[in-house]
């Protein structure tokens, strides 16, 4: 019995020793990870400097710090669940998850943080020196919370759309007000952009009506908007048919110029009709871009789906940040959370650009193709999680490239072509 008690005591002592060693190793690993991230430029202080550059408004210093910490929490957790952001923030700061979660919650309830007012600086930051923009307008819904968010995003070349302006409203309030909300968001972007900027708006069938065409024309915007096959299209020879009947037998893209649509015969510059073999349904596109060919208009409209993929990155539980699983009762809180998500999205995109610049993207490809197979956002997500355990020579490559990316942004603003 005495021998057994001695063995148990010895075993218990070894277990405690192993537990202490494990905790010590975890703490050492966490400290190393934080140092690695800080070396690359993804610490709270560097993100705070980024926000000061991106959102040049009169916010309290502590508020900007809270925004930067919340952004850091999203970067680490890749989640928009409030308590998960808090845990990510706590890890990054070696703090208390409880207090960090409360800080995130207070930030989301801070009425002094108004995304609608911050859009002036944010849009100018994202757009940069561009003289021509391709933007997509779409609704995304959160049925459990009776919320619907209208988003106007910039279509880019890196595989994802960059958030510009958004507004969340009660879904139950949309009846009779939907067009008013859309007008407000479109006009908000219009008043921010320089007058010389050429904007082409892409939108699906939910936005295809003659009043929208006239509204965009009055603003001086171009558009490519899909509409239903049953809508009457009258050509220049005064022949009127439902749009679907104007399709060619081969389904190849066809453009009709100087046409009129609907029974009211509203004049628009052109209509493009196409039913490619890869399409489930035909596309009937109303457009003001009569300067383009039918195939060019079709390709431009095809880029609209970038906004759907960005929605998935934000909403999906398995492949994104899981916003659809986060219950938020107040529409203003959701808009603030989307603001934090936008900050994180841009930082991860820039990190992905740095990875490509350093030639590290080839390590992510499972084939030998030359073109990009992962969006810059997804590449950035991977590199952020890989940084803590990254080999020194690879870390130096990424750190150098990321520094170059940020310097170009600060000095020449050419990097804004990336985001």
Question: Which residues are covered by each model-predicted region?
Answer:
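Short, well-ordered amphipathic alpha-helices
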Residues: 85-86, 152-153, 185-187
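Single, function-defining residue in the core of a domain
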Residues: 2-79, 119-120, 131-133, 157-419
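Short, basic interhelical loop/turn and adjoining N-cap
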Residues: 89-103
């Amino acid at each position: 019995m005495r021998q057994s008690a001695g063995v148990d005591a010895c075993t218990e002592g070894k277990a405690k020793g192993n537990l202490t060693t494990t905790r010590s190793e975890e703490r050492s690993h966490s400290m190393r990870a934080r140092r690695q991230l800080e070396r690359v430029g993804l610490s709270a202080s560097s993100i705070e400097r980024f926000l000061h550059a991106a959102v040049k408004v009169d916010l309290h210093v502590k508020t900007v710090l809270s925004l930067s910490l919340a952004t850091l929490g999203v970067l680490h957790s890749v989640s928009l669940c409030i308590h998960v952001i808090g845990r990510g923030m706590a890890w990054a700061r070696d703090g208390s998850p409880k207090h960090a979660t409360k800080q995130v919650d207070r930030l989301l309830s801070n009425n002094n943080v108004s995304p609608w007012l911050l859009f002036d600086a944010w849009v100018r930051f994202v757009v940069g020196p561009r003289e021509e923009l391709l933007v997509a307008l779409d609704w995304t819904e959160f049925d459990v919370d009776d919320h619907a968010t209208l988003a106007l995003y910039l279509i880019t070349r890196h595989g994802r759309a960059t958030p510009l302006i958004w507004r969340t409203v009660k879904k139950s309030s949309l009846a009779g007000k939907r067009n008013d909300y859309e007008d407000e968001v479109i006009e908000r972007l219009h008043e921010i952009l320089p007058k010389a900027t050429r904007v082409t708006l892409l939108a699906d069938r939910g936005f295809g009506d003659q009043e929208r065409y006239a509204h965009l024309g009055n603003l001086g915007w171009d558009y490519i908007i899909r509409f239903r096959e049953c809508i009457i299209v009258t050509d220049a020879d005064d022949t009127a048919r439902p749009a679907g009947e104007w399709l060619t037998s081969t389904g190849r893209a066809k453009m009709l110029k100087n046409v009129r649509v609907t029974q009211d015969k509203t004049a628009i510059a052109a209509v493009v009709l196409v039913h490619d073999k890869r399409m489930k349904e035909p596309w009937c596109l109303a457009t003001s871009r009569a300067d383009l060919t039918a195939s060019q208009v079709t390709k431009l409209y095809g880029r609209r789906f970038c906004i759907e993929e960005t929605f998935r990155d934000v909403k999906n539980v398995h492949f994104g940040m899981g916003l659809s699983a986060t219950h938020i009762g107040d529409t203003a809180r959701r808009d603030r959370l989307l603001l934090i998500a936008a900050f994180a999205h841009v930082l991860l995109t820039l990190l992905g650009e740095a990875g490509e610049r350093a030639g590290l993207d080839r390590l992510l490809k499972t084939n030998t193709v030359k073109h990009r197979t992962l969006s810059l956002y997804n590449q950035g997500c991977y590199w952020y999680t890989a940084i803590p355990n990254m080999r020194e020579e690879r870390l130096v490559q990424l750190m150098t490239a990321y520094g170059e990316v940020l310097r170009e942004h600060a000095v020449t603003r050419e990097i804004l072509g990336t985001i």
